[in-house]
Amino acid sequence: MNDLIINHIAELILPKSTDKPLKGKELDELNVVKNGTVVIKDGKIVYAGQHTDDYDATETIDASGKVVSPALVDAHTHLTFGGSREHEMSLKRQGKSYLEILEMGGGILSTVNATRETSEDDLFKKAEHDLLTMIKHGVLAVESKSGYGLDRENELKQLKVSNRLAEKYDLDMKHTFLGPHAVPKEASSNEAFLEEMIALLPEVKQYADFADIFCETGVFTIEQSQHYMQKAKEAGFKVKIHADEIDPLGGLELAIDEQAISADHLVASSDKGKEKLRNSDTVAVLLPATTFYLGKEDYADARGMLDNNGAIALATDYNPGSSVTNNLQLVMAIAALKLKLSPSEVWNAVTVNAAKAIDINAGTINTGDKANLVIWDAPNHEYIPYHFGINHAEKVIKDGKVIVDNTLSFKA
């Protein structure tokens, strides 16, 4: 006897399962089954496809008029941080620049101070609250970066918190050491601080899967970033890079040359960089909510990347300064509107390709896969990025069990 059948599904989303990320035109290929059925036993998918009455189960969910998809994957977050920076919104409205806010004690260094002052247990409680919000919105796989400690003690603290979260909730969660995220005030130079972070790599390896660096004007150069990435690979890490967010320094080209698993942001990437994606499996992780939140007009050139047969994914970039959202559904809407992605491209970018960007087996619904699914209160898959700003996830299913039920009930 099976454990659960989800029947009469209006649309069942079945992303293509591949060893490598979907590239170029492949991203627009999405198998959407009308009147579908999913059968689950022992936390695994037994069947997913056209409606059938050939299976029995102890529990049945009628998904008439609903969409079922793989659980979403958020491939770029800064989940563990102390404090918040809502007071900076009024400063921005007054016309204060980021550098002016930084000089006033705000910006990223404000978050660094708050993170340093927050105990590990309190940091865990805050991050847990934010993670549960993600889960309620349909996310069951997450990448979590450090980068707000900027010293040994507090970078380790952030990584330990994300590891504790993964253990408590048994999630597909990857952890990224982003020590070189900024340069703290106490550092004698960028170069000296970078060497401090490189020296930490062997110690943080037990807590982190990836090593990341912020390659940008005024932070770390291309040469420094390459040095760090090579040292990280020597220490056994797969590497990522925050690249070309503001200036076209060549971060995307560097990521491809160093065989990074992903390059993230890429708002200002050059045509040369986009062309190099053609022969690379490095995933371009685009973060349109960041561009939106910062009030900028120029978004990453997703269409240019796809035209060059590149692989792209989408993520929230959840952080307290430039993308204060942990709702990946909102990112899907912004990507459709501003990156000009089709519904199929959007869905693949938050499932199977996002999984490839963090090196996990997720984002598909195939026989034998973990039964990590979302039942959406939506008539079709195009409706979710169309009707933006709300939570369409009705039920979230992890390992075959409903762990979130957002069904609303009211008393008159």
Curated annotation (Swiss-Prot):
Q: Which HAMAP family match?
A: HutI
List ligand-binding residues for 4-imidazolone-5-propanoate: 85, 148, 181, 245, 322
Q: Which GO terms describe its molecular function?
A: imidazolonepropionase activity; iron ion binding; zinc ion binding
On cofactor binding, the record's note says: Binds 1 zinc or iron ion per subunit.
Its source organism is Staphylococcus aureus (strain JH9)
Binding residues for Fe(3+): 76, 78, 242, 317
Highest taxon of the source? Bacteria
Q: Which reaction does it catalyse?
A: 4-imidazolone-5-propanoate + H2O = N-formimidoyl-L-glutamate
PANTHER family per UniProt: IMIDAZOLONEPROPIONASE (PTHR42752), IMIDAZOLONEPROPIONASE-RELATED (PTHR42752:SF1)
Question: Which NCBIfam families does the entry link to?
Answer: hutI
Would you tell me the Gene Ontology cellular component terms? cytoplasm
Primary location class: cytoplasm
Briefly, what is this protein's role?
A: Catalyzes the hydrolytic cleavage of the carbon-nitrogen bond in imidazolone-5-propanoate to yield N-formimidoyl-L-glutamate. It is the third step in the universal histidine degradation pathway.
State the compartments where it is located: Cytoplasm
Family the entry assigns? Belongs to the metallo-dependent hydrolases superfamily. HutI family.
The record's listing under InterPro entries reads:
Amidohydro-rel, HutI, Metal-dep_hydrolase_composite, Metal_Hydrolase
Q: Which UniProt keywords apply?
A: Cytoplasm, Histidine metabolism, Hydrolase, Iron, Metal-binding, Zinc
Cofactor dependence is on:
Zn(2+); Fe(3+)
Cite the annotated pathway.
Amino-acid degradation; L-histidine degradation into L-glutamate; N-formimidoyl-L-glutamate from L-histidine: step 3/3
Give the protein name, as stated in the record: Imidazolonepropionase
EC numbers listed for it are 3.5.2.7
Example GO biological process: L-histidine catabolic process to glutamate and formate
